[in-house]
Amino acid sequence: MSEQKPSLTYRDAGVDIDAGNDLVNRIKSTAARTRRPEVLGGLGGFGAMVSIPAGYKEPVLVSGTDGVGTKLRLAMQLQKHDSIGIDLVAMCVNDLVVGGAEPLFFLDYYATGKLNVDVAAQVVEGIGQGCEQAGCALVGGETAEMPGMYEGDDYDLAGFCVGIVERDKIIDGSRAQPGDSLLALGSSGPHSNGYSLIRKIIEVSGADLSQSMGDTTLADALMAPTRIYVKNLLKLIREVDVRALSHITGGGLPENIPRVLPKGTIAALDTQSWELPPVFQWLQNAGGVAQEEMYRTFNCGIGMVICVPEDQKALAMDTLNAMGEKVWQIGVMEAAESSDAEPVVRYAPGLLTA
C-alpha cells in the first residue's frame, strides 16, 4: 500500500490568509477617517472608484509613486513603525503639490516575508495619518506576504497617489524668471532621503542613537516624519503667484531645484541664509561629509523651495508664517549667459546680505 502524501496548505508555504484578513479588518476604520465625498464604495473591492470633484472646467489628473528607501531599515532596527507611513504619503503628495495639484486618493503596497499584523497595522495607521494631513483618501492597497523574498517580517513599502489640478492652474516652472525670489520651507529632518549614507555614518562612527540631539534624541531626530506641505501650499497658491515649487528629496538642492526651472536661468542660493539644523551638523561631523556632498544628498533643513515674484515675496512669507511654516528667503533667480543653458544651482554665500 502506497504511503499517503501530506496535504499541504498555503499556511505550510508561509502565507497566512487569515492574518491578511485580520489586517484588512483592523485598517478599515483608518481608511474610513480619510474618506472624501468623491470616493465610491469602501475597501475590499477589486478596484477603487473615485469621481472627479465638482467645479473643475478642465481637470488634469496628476499621478505619482514613491517609497521611503532605507529609512525602513532604521525603523525596523528601532522597532518604530508608527510614523513611517506618514513618510510614505509625504513623499508622494509633496511631489503632486509641486504641480499645483490637490491629492485626491492614495494606495499603498506592503510586501513582507512573514506578515506581522501588529507592525503592518501601525504602518497603515501612519499612512492614514498622512492622508488626513494631505486631505486625500486612502482607497486601497496590497499586502503581499512573500516567504523567501524577504527575511522574516522585514517589509518594504510603496505608495501611489493621484491628484487633480485645473489645466490653467498647473505650476510647471516655465514662468520662473530672473529677479524672482526663492523661499525655503523648513524640513523636520532628513525626511526620507539619504538613509543609506546615514546608516553608514552610524555604523562607522559607532553612534549611540539614544544620545541627545537638541531637545530630542538622535534616533527620534532621524526618524522624524517627513513634513507634508500640501494644505499650506494649496492655500498659498490661492493667495500668491507661485511660479515654481521644488520638493527637496534625493539629490538635494542642486538636483531638485533645476528640475522645475526653465532653460537660461540660475537659482542663486545664499548658503549663509540658514544654519544646518543639529541633526545635519551631526551627520556632517560624524561622517566627515564634504559640504557639496551634504547639499546633493540631504535636504539640509529645506523641504520645499518656492519661486515667487519679488513684489509678492512679503505676502508669501506673511501667508506662510501665519500658517505656522518656518520660511525664509534662500536666494534669487538669475539669468544664465545663454538662453539655451540648462538651469543650474549656484551657491552664493552672502548674496542676500551684500
UniProtKB/Swiss-Prot annotation:
Q: Which SUPFAM superfamilies match?
A: PurM C-terminal domain-like, PurM N-terminal domain-like
Instruction: Report the catalytic activity.
Output: 2-formamido-N(1)-(5-O-phospho-beta-D-ribosyl)acetamidine + ATP = 5-amino-1-(5-phospho-beta-D-ribosyl)imidazole + ADP + phosphate + H(+)
Q: Does the keyword Cytoplasm apply?
A: yes
Location (main, coarse)? cytoplasm
Q: Which UniProt keywords apply?
A: ATP-binding, Cytoplasm, Ligase, Nucleotide-binding, Purine biosynthesis
Q: Which InterPro entries match?
A: PurM-like_C_dom (IPR010918), PurM-like_C_sf (IPR036676), PurM-like_N (IPR016188), PurM-like_N_sf (IPR036921), PurM_cligase (IPR004733)
Concerning its family, UniProt says: Belongs to the AIR synthase family.
Query: What's the protein called, per UniProt?
Result: Phosphoribosylformylglycinamidine cyclo-ligase
